[in-house]
Design a protein with these regions (language model features):
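Alpha/beta-hydrolase-fold serine-hydrolase catalytic core, especially in secreted/extracellular enzymes
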Residues: 28, 33-35, 40-42, 51-52, ...
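Domain-level recognition of soluble alpha/beta enzyme cores
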Residues: 23-132, 344, 355
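Short substrate-entry loop that stabilizes the transition state in hydrolases
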Residues: 114-129, 134-172, 292-294
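Alpha/beta-hydrolase active-site loop
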Residues: 172-229
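Active-site machinery of serine-nucleophile hydrolases
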Residues: 72-80, 85-96, 100-102, 143-189, ...
């Protein structure tokens, strides 16, 4: 504990003495928490091309849409299988995170040392499991909620996540082709033009998820073994920030999706016709107590209030936007760069429990989410029923 209190002073000393590289030795990053389920977890990275859509609006629109997908699934590791890294291309990812959060780059050098709990290309368990699809926020990554991906796969789900190219912080394609995010809004646009731009991005994101769903029933990109492990009669979507809004939109238009979960979701870009319609699917939102944009949660309340299926809102005292990702899980220093006061193990437990029990009920016919029990177990929760 004494070292933790002295970290700001240590950083200043090392920085000023040009020995900043040593700080990464003094401040290691935590590994991904071990999942609690019965299954070991495999992972694969898949390059998919949608020839029916253009890459993005703008200069690249003449090329087909490409997305990089990562999948986590119940696995049977064999002798000789290797553990997968938390992220590939860790230096590039570390630099991107550093720039996005204002974190000194030398503090991200240990990103390569974060250990996950998955086996690369391990053979899938020979059973069928419900499918989940995750959507990241603006500037996010497909791996940003690896904690939840591994947890859900260990409990018998196949979890897909894609980099929404041009909207992700960075997408790395075969041949080391790199596409950085290009979705910043120009300052010279009117308010109406800005929201039209966001809705165009939202449409592309939702179409990415629908393309993923289409490909799960084909053999263009998925191995036969992985395809055979998919229970396509039970599908859920979840997402963080803009990805939460994306999940709502795609759930509202695609009958293949059975349930939807938002993690501190951004509702402002969602069209009014979606908010004012009946989602008619179970929906839960887990997020911070309030947003600076007060209208965000007003739109959440409109969506949930119009939903004829079960809806609930769980607000977490002491949490901020990035506590609902892996960001706060790897170092106490993240509290200096945007994570909240809630302890990392605590927000991890709340998030994992809510996601697992929600989808267990609606995709596996498990017990209903016991909100009265949640109120006792997690006094930091504010629960709103609709």
């Amino acid at each position: 504990m004494q070292l933790i209190r002295q970290i700001p002073l240590l950083i200043s000393v090392f920085w000023l003495s040009a020995c900043a590289a040593l700080v990464s030795v003094l401040i290691p990053l935590e590994n991904v928490a071990k999942p609690t389920g019965e299954y070991q977890v495999g992972t694969q990275v898949i390059h998919m091309v949608d020839n029916d859509r253009s890459a993005w609006y703008g200069q690249e629109s003449s090329n087909p849409r490409e997305i990089m997908v990562r999948v986590w699934y119940p696995a049977q590791p064999q002798e000789g299988d290797l553990k997968a890294p938390y992220v590939y291309n860790e230096k590039l990812i570390g630099d991107m995170v550093s720039e996005g959060f204002g974190i000194p780059k030398y503090l991200m050098k240990n990103l390569r040392n974060i250990n996950g709990n998955t086996w690369s290309e391990a053979h899938p368990v020979n059973e069928k499991f419900p499918v989940l699809i995750f959507s990241h926020g603006i500037g996010g990554l497909k791996t940003q909620n690896t904690t939840q991906m591994e947890e859900m796969a260990s409990h018998g789900y196949v979890v897909f996540s894609c980099d929404h190219a041009y909207d992700a912080g960075v997408s790395i394609f075969p041949g080391d082709r790199i596409i950085f995010g290009k979705t910043n809004i120009p300052d010279n646009l009117t308010k109406e033009e800005k929201w039209n731009m966001r809705r165009a991005q939202l449409d592309y994101r939702a179409a990415d998820i629908q393309f993923l769903l289409d490909e799960m029933d084909r053999e263009n990109f998925l191995s036969v073994a992985l395809k055979n492990s998919l229970d396509l009669e039970h599908i859920g979507v979840f997402g963080h920030s803009f990805g939460g809004g994306t999940s709502v939109v795609v759930a509202s238009v695609d009958e293949r999706i059975d349930a939807c979960f938002g993690l501190d979701a951004w509702f402002l870009p969602i069209p009014s016709n979606v908010l004012n319609s009946d989602l008619n699917k179970p929906f839960i939102h887990l997020g911070q107590v309030s947003w600076k944009e007060k209208e965000n949660y007003l739109k959440l309340d409109t969506l949930a209030g119009n939903n004829s299926a079960w809806s609930v809102r769980l607000d977490v005292r002491g949490a901020t936007h990035y506590d609902f990702t892996d960001f706060s899980q790897f170092s106490k220093l993240t509290k200096k760069y945007g994570s909240g006061m809630i302890a990392p193990p605590r927000i991890r437990k709340i998030t994992n429990s809510a996601i697992r029990e929600f989808f267990d009920h609606y995709l596996k016919n498990g017990p209903a989410l016991a909100l009265e029990t949640y109120e006792k177990l997690y006094p930091e929760l504010i629960i709103k029923r609709y």
